[in-house]
């Protein structure tokens, strides 16, 4: 990743990878480090949610933060998403910068009024007088064997709403840099993590370990350069896309993989530049197909000069249009894989 230094602040640029892989870091540790650094940096920042303090969080994302920063900065709440989300929004109105953790974004539906009607609308309805600097974060999408009510992907839901920023990290670099940017942002940010990615380790450069490392919201990253097809994805879909790119390389297909990182604002320019080079486009997401992120990409392609650059129709790889089954074999059948991505690319390129 190319970087520029603004004063003491390291800011990640659009494309590429870290300058040097100094070590590895899990997504869990990256999120923990980001919150630790921002709580220390700004005394207006605090974390609240179910079991985030003494228990260290349901997924141990906040491990050690309560002991280090105390119960005014890391706050356990009752099991009432509507209640503690409302408290968090009110705190943001008052000038604090809360991080509101949902144990799973499936439960954010209990707090949807606070997110959509209070957090997302207040800056507009106050004519810019009342900013709402809040981060709603937690695991989103399919996990492992948690069935229909705990496996939903809300990316497209929240990206549909003006007034929100929506971020979907893939790697440890994404997780740390984007969460720090979200906490510093004066707008409400929905920060959609993935439970399966929490324990995965990624190489990180020296700059990622800096207290001042941030990744700009709204800028995609070219995870892998290629010439024959553009594969666009986010969150765990990037994993499938990169694995597919490796398989395609073995048959002589050079795939460019774009990690969107942010869904709103949306970096369509990176897609445009890539398709002008490859002339083929495949989108990958784990959520449902109807009105999904791939659908929005397709619409923007149709409405721009990118459409004239395509040598084949855009193809979408998505989850299956059903509630998530509980049975392991059926759950696997409901989610996209690298093989699905390879199949879509071959269809786009008209190769066997």
From Swiss-Prot:
The protein's name: Pyruvate dehydrogenase E1 component subunit beta, mitochondrial
* Originating organism: Caenorhabditis elegans
* GO terms of biological process kind: pyruvate decarboxylation to acetyl-CoA
Q: What is its EC number?
A: 1.2.4.1
Enzyme superclass (EC): oxidoreductase
Q: Which reaction does it catalyse?
A: N(6)-[(R)-lipoyl]-L-lysyl-[protein] + pyruvate + H(+) = N(6)-[(R)-S(8)-acetyldihydrolipoyl]-L-lysyl-[protein] + CO2
Coiled coil ranges (UniProt) are none
Which compartments is it annotated to reside in? Mitochondrion matrix
